[in-house]
Curated annotation (Swiss-Prot):
Protein role: Required for the formation of a threonylcarbamoyl group on adenosine at position 37 (t(6)A37) in mitochondrial tRNAs that read codons beginning with adenine. Probably involved in the transfer of the threonylcarbamoyl moiety of threonylcarbamoyl-AMP (TC-AMP) to the N6 group of A37. Involved in mitochondrial genome maintenance.
Subcellular location: Mitochondrion
GO annotation (BP), single: tRNA threonylcarbamoyladenosine modification
Keywords, comma-separated and alphabetical: Acetylation, Acyltransferase, Metal-binding, Mitochondrion, Transferase, Transit peptide, tRNA processing
Gene: OSGEPL1
Cofactor field: a divalent metal cation
Enzyme Commission number: 2.3.1.234
The species this protein was found in: Homo sapiens (Human)
Name of the protein this chain belongs to: tRNA N6-adenosine threonylcarbamoyltransferase, mitochondrial
Binding site for a divalent metal cation: H147, H151, D358
Protein residues bound to substrate: L169, I170, S171, G172, G173, D202, G222, E226, S329, N330, T357
Amino acid sequence: MLILTKTAGVFFKPSKRKVYEFLRSFNFHPGTLFLHKIVLGIETSCDDTAAAVVDETGNVLGEAIHSQTEVHLKTGGIVPPAAQQLHRENIQRIVQEALSASGVSPSDLSAIATTIKPGLALSLGVGLSFSLQLVGQLKKPFIPIHHMEAHALTIRLTNKVEFPFLVLLISGGHCLLALVQGVSDFLLLGKSLDIAPGDMLDKVARRLSLIKHPECSTMSGGKAIEHLAKQGNRFHFDIKPPLHHAKNCDFSFTGLQHVTDKIIMKKEKEEGIEKGQILSSAADIAATVQHTMACHLVKRTHRAILFCKQRDLLPQNNAVLVASGGVASNFYIRRALEILTNATQCTLLCPPPRLCTDNGIMIAWNGIERLRAGLGILHDIEGIRYEPKCPLGVDISKEVGEASIKVPQLKMEI
């Protein structure tokens, strides 16, 4: 979603009485003895209030989520104070639903894991404040979670994936390529120099007024573009992928957005319609934008694979590429990445679409991973703060660019 403002402020702090009443609402019968680790994960980094209970074997014992998509579609993007208020209104209910569904008493939890970075400050604050109150009442360890690390490691919940592996994280707020060498060991190969791909898709969908399209009125921008693109001609407009001559693994999407805006303005004049009306060529525009984005993602990822293999950071055969984040739920982009992995003797793995978007399961699982590895488990919660901006791992993107790797052309027959 498009972020309309960057409001900062003091985060919501639930009263101790409310948390105490919340805990008293659980009346579990004794008898079940949990012999393994169980983590409650809480996610409020953007516009989804989510919670889940996961055990160390990867079983999802309970989950709940409240999506704000419908509200933000009406405002044309996420308004942080509005998102904060919706998190406040729903977080207690969502956590309670996840715990109730799991059948796990709060006292039987091994730890509580919560997203504290990166994300919208006001949204992060709600989740952190609620979690710290809960941790204080239950006297449980607290595990701070990096949102993008959680996306990267989700695949280890659904598939047996060993380190190292390459991950492409693509969402509404992020776009990066990283080598995952361990639970908390990441090498950043490239990132977006401007906006994220999901943000760009939302802006294009908004400019095309797809919320007025009868088939797309309840869809997020990215989903609307993917849906409409199936009906369009991806070659109707000639748009070159961004950073075509830059031999690194960085991404850029503002140029693609601006070119698309010009095409839309031109077509509006040709069709004699005003801004805000649906173009007859909307499906062709959606298909072209989606295809161009896919080609851009593939080329940068191709270079990352070649770089990692040249430096023996990945095995020469059967290396794993993981695509995660909300945009990775786009099946056209997945098929494009499959063409790449087939050409480079790699294996493409993607979490199920529902685990690509923000969710509590990935946060709880990241907590399990850290609990097993003994990393970042806090018993003293004094001074913990959320971090709206936070890099991922060690940045070696300059080294990647200096390698100046030429990428062979691939036939994108999708």
